[in-house]
From Swiss-Prot:
Cofactor: heme b
NCBIfam families linked to this entry: cat_per_HPI, PRK15061.1
Pfam families, per database record: peroxidase
Catalysed reaction equations from the record: H2O2 + AH2 = A + 2 H2O; 2 H2O2 = O2 + 2 H2O
GO molecular function: catalase activity; heme binding; metal ion binding
Name of the protein in question: Catalase-peroxidase 2
Covalent cross-link Tryptophyl-tyrosyl-methioninium (Tyr-Met) (with W-113), where: 238-264
Protein family according to the UniProt entry: Belongs to the peroxidase family. Peroxidase/catalase subfamily.
Residue numbers spanned by region Disordered: 1-43
Polar residues bias spans: 1-24
Residues the entry annotates as binding heme b: 279
Function of the protein: Bifunctional enzyme with both catalase and broad-spectrum peroxidase activity. May play a role in the intracellular survival of mycobacteria.
Biological-process GO terms, alphabetical: cellular response to hydrogen peroxide; hydrogen peroxide catabolic process
Length: 748
């Protein structure tokens, strides 16, 4: 392997590279962790939760400052001028990185796809919403070879438009423009993605080598990808295009395709549309010996200025480019939208061959079609070629049925690809209210739509009256608080899904989630619905209250009463404006992935879960976007309020349950209590009097972590102090309101 570096500095010694792989990049160097590296606290004590995960993207790292308002800056952008500049860029081939066929469209489509395509449904992480492709590890994934060049091609445009367009939006929008520049009619586009300024630690796999697969598949007969992963292979976006583990089996590859694209919320038709549509353009690159490619951007020498994979094969660019190690041109019109991909896929029989770099691919059998595929730089015509995963679109019975239909009805492919591409680019952005710009398409089911407000909202007098009504309804404060939490706590800050807006807690599937205690919901919701109906029937001026608003308002009223019972007078801020979604506009299957495996705030864990409870509590806190102090305040407050799942008393360290007090912290930190593992109940601890041995409390790890974890204990000590009872109550209220308003993007 040659790193092809200048003599001024050696390659980065912190990353070693491997030159053997059975993956998409058969010999392109991949990073390996440095042995003997200094250990972090997490390395010494891997079972301790890392609460720093709750504080990603600190404002100190943002060069634009905390007051920067991207939506406000974007409003100044001439989007048509930006689009025109991007369209012009497509055919402005640069000598330092020449365009295939004189058009950068294929490269930019891949850039946008690989930016958005990291999204995964099980935890909502990934996607193009933050411009993460600029940072490690994604900028150095083996699957992203040469995308560093694509981003550098965009720099003059980013420099020109400045803060008015984020990198996150630009990376995704450019692919959309690329499609349109080659004759495709897209479905629309929404701006609104805000940049991050440093990478976030995301678990993309437990393998200690890129291109590994050994830690994400179980040993069962059926190959099944572990949750929450969205890719078959460490460092790839979806699947190995040579087939599973580099074995060129199109049918086996179809299984992997279906699973990984499903992890991105795509069904079979959407998956086929993306592959067929995306592979209508451009080519792959495997011109020669991949061992001649240098290290990835994060390991490249400093003088390469963030560009990686410098190749010493020929010129290292243009006709000598090595990106994936595969050398495939799918169609005879690689810069034009048409149906040629399917015409060629079904127009030939195919035989297994290898690229010049040694990667498995297919070529039209017996020399058929020789010379019909144009060379990207004017060389002799080529034979038709396809990836192993392209052949999957023909031989898999389900994909084959879909693609054969499109072969005869190309207009159906155009519509399917347009909608699937739009979904791909926007899946992690949350509700349509977050979209900016003039080209936003009509709401789609996968965006979890809620109706617009079409009536006057309740005022302060109405709010006070409704609070009084719910407190006199016969429902307990605990029932009201639990229902409000159940409604709001489905929110995921990763992909901005879930939350109280829409009142989907009353709909399938949420109303039957075990964590939400369906039987109790069935008691509480009808009472609140009657209050809503009575108010709406009698309110003056056409004012109405949605059930979504009333659920949150009822929880607020209950907290105010609980605080008063604890000796504190507080007002829980409330902002009306939520509306009620319909079952018709709620995709049950799509929402199923939001069901919590555990919710430590309610001391709930799904039967059979073996992951440490405190780790799942931290994950839930991360989804809710709360800080370590907010996490601490919320758990302590909810325990004092006695709102555990199923009414258990674990962590209810108080002799006045239901009152909002700091008793949880006072009693947790009481050295008169000794904690022991329960001998009879899994995941339960017993707190006994040190002198008498008498049982005082029971708890789970969700409770005791606030005494055992040094960072969380430091916060708990603040709230346990004799002078901080009121501070705790106020902090709890602020954290509660944050959770209730997480999905109120209209307030932000």
């Amino acid at each position: 392997m040659s790193s092809d570096t200048s003599d001024s500095r050696p390659p980065n010694p912190d990353t070693k590279t491997a030159s053997t792989s059975e993956s998409e990049n058969p010999a392109i160097p991949s990073p390996k962790p440095k042995s003997g590296a200094p250990l972090r606290n997490q390395d010494w004590w891997p079972n301790q939760i890392d609460v720093s995960r709750l504080h990603p993207h600190p404002p100190q790292g943002n060069p634009l400052g905390e007051d920067f308002d991207y939506a406000e800056e974007f409003a100044k952008l001439d989007v048509n001028a930006l689009k025109a500049d991007l369209t012009a860029l497509m055919t402005q081939s640069q000598d330092w990185w020449p365009a295939d066929y004189g058009h950068y469209g294929g490269l930019f489509i891949r850039m946008s796809w690989h930016s958005a395509g990291t999204y995964r449904i099980h935890d909502g992480r990934g996607g193009g919403g933050q411009g993460a492709q600029r940072f490690a590890p994604i900028n150095s994934w083996p699957d992203n070879v040469s995308l560093d060049k694509a981003r550098r091609l965009l720099w003059p445009i980013k420099q020109k438009y400045g803060n008015k367009i984020s990198w996150a939006d630009l990376l995704v929008f450019t692919g959309n423009v690329a499609l349109e520049s080659m004759g495709f009619k897209t479905f629309g586009f929404g701006f609104g993605r805000e940049d991050i300024w440093e990478p976030e630690e995301i678990l993309f796999g437990e393998e200690d080598e890129w291109l590994g697969t050994d830690k994400r598949y179980g040993g069962g007969e059926q190959r099944q990808l572990a949750e929450p992963y969205g890719a078959t292979t460490m460092g790839l976006i979806y699947v190995n295009p040579e087939g599973p583990e580099g074995q060129p089996d199109p049918l086996a590859a179809a299984h992997d395709i279906r699973e990984t694209f499903g992890r991105m919320a795509m069904n079979d038709e959407e998956t086929a549309a993306l592959i067929v549509g995306g592979h209508t353009f451009g080519k792959t690159h495997g011109a020669g010996d991949a061992s001649l490619v240098g290290p990835e951007p994060e390991a490249a020498p400093i003088e390469q200025q963030g560009l990686g994979w410098k190749s010493s094969y020929g010129t290292g660019k243009g006709p000598d480019t090595i990106t994936s190690g595969l050398e495939v041109v799918w169609t005879n019109t690689p810069t034009k939208w048409d149906n040629s991909f399917l015409e060629i896929l079904y127009g030939y029989e195919w035989e297994l061959t290898k690229s010049p770099a040694g990667a498995w691919q297919f070529t039209a059998k017996d020399g058929a079609g020789a010379g019909t595929i144009p060379d990207p730089f004017g060389g002799p015509g080529r034979n038709p070629t396809m990836l192993v995963t392209d052949i999957s679109m023909r031989v898999d019975p389900i994909y084959g049925k879909i693609t054969r239909r499109w072969l005869d009805h190309p207009e159906e492919l155009s519509e399917a690809f347009a909608k699937a591409w739009y979904k791909l680019l926007h899946r992690d952005m949350g509700p349509i209210s977050r979209y900016l710009g003039p080209w936003v398409a009509e709401p789609q089911l996968w965006q979890d739509p809620v109706p617009a407000v079409d009536h006057p909202l309740v005022d302060d007098q109405d709010i006070a009256a409704l609070k009084s009504t719910v407190l006199d309804s016969g429902l307990s404060t605990g029932q009201l608080i639990k229902t409000a939490w159940a409604s709001a706590a489905s929110y995921r800050n990763t992909d901005k899904r879930g939350g109280a807006n829409g009142a989907r807690v009353r709909l399938e599937p949420q109303k039957n989630w075990d964590v939400n205690e369906p039987a109790e919901l069935a008691t509480v919701l009808p009472v609140l619905e009657r209050i809503q109906q009575d108010f709406n029937a009698s309110a003056s001026g056409g004012k109405k209250v949605s059930l979504a608003d009333l659920i949150v308002l009822a929880g607020s009223a209950a907290i105010e009463k609980a605080a008063k019972d604890g000796g504190y007078n507080v007002t829980v801020p409330f902002a009306p404006g939520r509306t009620d979604a319909s079952q018709e506009n709620t995709d049950v299957e799509s929402f199923a992935v939001l069901e919590p495996r555990a919710d430590g705030f309610r001391n709930y864990v799904r039967p059979g879960e073996k992951v440490q409870l405190e780790k799942m509590l931290l994950e839930r806190a991360y989804f809710l976007g709360v800080t370590a102090p907010q996490l601490t305040a919320l758990v302590g407050g909810l325990r004092a309020l006695d709102v555990n799942h199923g009414g258990t008393k674990h962590g209810v360290f108080t002799d006045r349950p239901g009152a909002l007090t700091n008793d949880f912290f006072v009693n947790l930190l009481d050295m008169g209590t000794e904690w022991k593992t329960s001998e009879t109940t899994e995941n339960v601890y017993e707190g006994v009097d040190r002198k008498t041995g008498q049982l005082k409390w029971t708890a789970t790890a969700n409770d005791l972590v606030f005494g055992s974890h040094s960072v969380l204990r430091a916060v708990a000590e603040v709230y346990a102090q004799s002078d901080n009872g009121e501070r705790f109550v106020n902090d709890f209220v602020k954290a509660w309101v944050k959770v209730m308003n997480n999905d109120r993007f209209d307030l932000k």
